[in-house]
Amino acid sequence: DGDKIIVRLASQGSFTSGSSDLRQAFTPTLTRLGNSLAQYPGSVMVEGHTDDVPVAFSERFKSNWDLSAARAASSAACVLTSTDLEGGNVQIAGFADTRPLDTNDTPSGRARNRRIEVIVDDN
């Protein structure tokens, strides 16, 4: 097995609730991350994760699966358009609430589960 680097970014402050539109203040964070990732060989997976609260009042997203995938795509697009990272090395995935870090029974647990993870694999 090869080594992996996992960068975990909390969604608080990065997206508006129920949206995949990046907040402008979050863009510099993704740009810095992308510039760092461009220095490493290997593949990059951008994963979107949500809590277990269903998406409400959204015509665009029918489920947390849709929302998590769209957030991963939005994050990857930001990195690719603002850095020298090669697009052929980047993949996206949405996992909805299937890989929680914490309980979904508390506000703090749900907040921890809403995140973007960027995984760098040297294979």
Name the predicted role of every residue range.
Residues 1, 30-39:
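Short amphipathic alpha-helices and their capping/turn segments at secondary-structure boundaries
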Residues 1-8:
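Short edge beta-strands and adjacent turn/loop segments
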Residues 37, 41-43, 87, 113:
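A general structural motif
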